[in-house]
Amino acid sequence: MDLATMLQNLVTEGGSIGWGLYYLGKLLGAGVAMGIGAIGPGVGEGNIGAHAMDAMARQPEMSGNLTTRMLLAMAVTESTGLYSLVVALILLFVLP
């Protein structure tokens, strides 16, 4: 028995309590997806910024090149946070 069937049985047999549990699960799942999905980009962007500032302090003549690479790395790192946002929105609005 797969998870979708189990949820459907819970909803149909549980009445209003089943629907409440179902929506509670959707909300908790979306919250956990965004919460955990935001930790990685936050830590990663902090490390990128700290190391870029350290590199610029050591070699000021390379600051333009380092800034470009830092912004590119931050954009790639932030994409995982956006993916978790998409998953949370799917959990909230797309799944029945």
Curated annotation (Swiss-Prot):
The record marks E78 as: Reversibly protonated during proton transport. Keywords: ATP synthesis, Cell inner membrane, Cell membrane, CF(0), Hydrogen ion transport, Ion transport, Lipid-binding, Membrane, Transmembrane, Transmembrane helix, Transport. The chain crosses the membrane at residues 28-50, 75-95. SUPFAM superfamilies: F1F0 ATP synthase subunit C. InterPro entries: ATP_synth_csu_bac/chlpt, ATP_synth_F0_csu, ATP_synth_F0_csu_DDCD_BS, ATP_synth_F0_csu_sf, ATPase_proteolipid_c-like_dom, F/V-ATP_Csub_sf. GO terms for cellular component: plasma membrane; proton-transporting ATP synthase complex; proton-transporting two-sector ATPase complex, proton-transporting domain. It is found in: Cell inner membrane. Its main location: membrane. GO terms for molecular function: lipid binding; proton-transporting ATP synthase activity, rotational mechanism. The keyword Membrane applies. The keyword Manganese does not apply. It is a multi-pass membrane protein. Gene3D superfamilies: F1F0 ATP synthase subunit C. F(1)F(0) ATP synthase produces ATP from ADP in the presence of a proton or sodium gradient. F-type ATPases consist of two structural domains, F(1) containing the extramembraneous catalytic core and F(0) containing the membrane proton channel, linked together by a central stalk and a peripheral stalk. During catalysis, ATP synthesis in the catalytic domain of F(1) is coupled via a rotary mechanism of the central stalk subunits to proton translocation. F-type ATPases have 2 components, F(1) - the catalytic core - and F(0) - the membrane proton channel. F(1) has five subunits: alpha(3), beta(3), gamma(1), delta(1), epsilon(1). F(0) has three main subunits: a(1), b(2) and c(10-14). The alpha and beta chains form an alternating ring which encloses part of the gamma chain. F(1) is attached to F(0) by a central stalk formed by the gamma and epsilon chains, while a peripheral stalk is formed by the delta and b chains. Belongs to the ATPase C chain family. NCBIfam families: ATP_synt_c, PRK13471.1. This is ATP synthase subunit c. It comes from Petrotoga mobilis (strain DSM 10674 / SJ95). The lineage of its organism: Bacteria, Thermotogati, Thermotogota, Thermotogae, Petrotogales. The gene is atpE.
